[in-house]
Amino acid sequence: MRIAAMAAGAVGSYFGGRLQAAGHDVAYIARRANLEALKKDGLKIQSVHGDLHLPKVFATPDPKEVGPVDIVLFAVKLWDTETAAELTKPMIGPNTRVITLQNGVDSYERVSAILGKQHVIPGTAYIAAVLGGPGVMLHTSKFAIMRCGRLDGSKDAQLDKFVEAAKAANIDIQPQDDMNRERWQKFIFLSSMAGVNCLTRMEIGKVLGEPHTRAFYKKLMEESFAISQKLGVKVAPNWVEDRMRSEEHTSELQSHLNLVCRLLLEK
């Protein structure tokens, strides 16, 4: 399949790299130092599941150089959503699917308003990953999960084709029939973790290991969970308790927001 990583940050680079290693034609939208490193040295992934070096990758700052693709992995930060969606237009063909792998609960609607609902698939990504430098992606968690599906639960042949391709590339991809529930579950988890990370300056393993911060973290999730229930989102009643025991709470897991907070404090 022809696939574009919009853009070549940690999430786009990881999934794009795994798909390219499996033989798919992947384009990486990048800029500045990251772009130059990708062009010169290729993409390097350092992962607990095995390192990967792709010495030759197609990286460009201009989606017009890519043209229509089968799948766009849309993984920019939320504040860049509208700008990135506009830039994505040259990569949209009649059967293109754009999978939104962003945090939050409204990226699907925002991207759909620009590219059209027929092209956009809501998704979530569970992965602890950062750029370790230009052209270098660091994956530090045992998990690297992609979840996606039509918001109304309907089948999509192009998405099904991508799911099979991702599975063949050893990507843990999990199709969902209720993506509204899935994106809210991710939001409840991540917004709470980001808040407690930034307040305490502690990774989640340390938060869970101290009774007061553990209780505070749980309370944050319960408040977000209550909002989801008021909105009619079908999150399971015991979801917060299950999340507190989840293996996704690896000892050094922290939100990207916490990394930003730390960098600002160091300046």
Residue ranges and their predicted role:
Residues 1-47, 51:
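NAD(P)+-binding Rossmann beta1-loop-alpha1 motif at the extreme N-terminus of oxidoreductases
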Residues 4, 27, 97-99, 121, ...:
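A structural signal for isolated positions on well-ordered beta-strands in alpha/beta enzyme cores
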Residues 17, 21, 86-90, 113, ...:
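Short, well-ordered alpha-helices that flank and scaffold nucleotide-derived cofactor binding pockets
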Residues 28, 59-60, 148, 259:
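Generic preference for hydrophobic
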Residues 52-137:
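Rossmann-like NAD(P)(H) cofactor-binding subdomain of soluble oxidoreductases
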Residues 90-91, 114-121, 132-241:
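Internal alpha-helical scaffold of NAD(P)-dependent oxidoreductase catalytic cores
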Residues 239-247, 251:
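Basic, nucleic-acid-binding surfaces and adjacent catalytic neighborhoods in DNA/RNA-processing proteins
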Residues 248-267:
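Single conserved hydrophobic/aromatic residue that forms the stacking wall/gate
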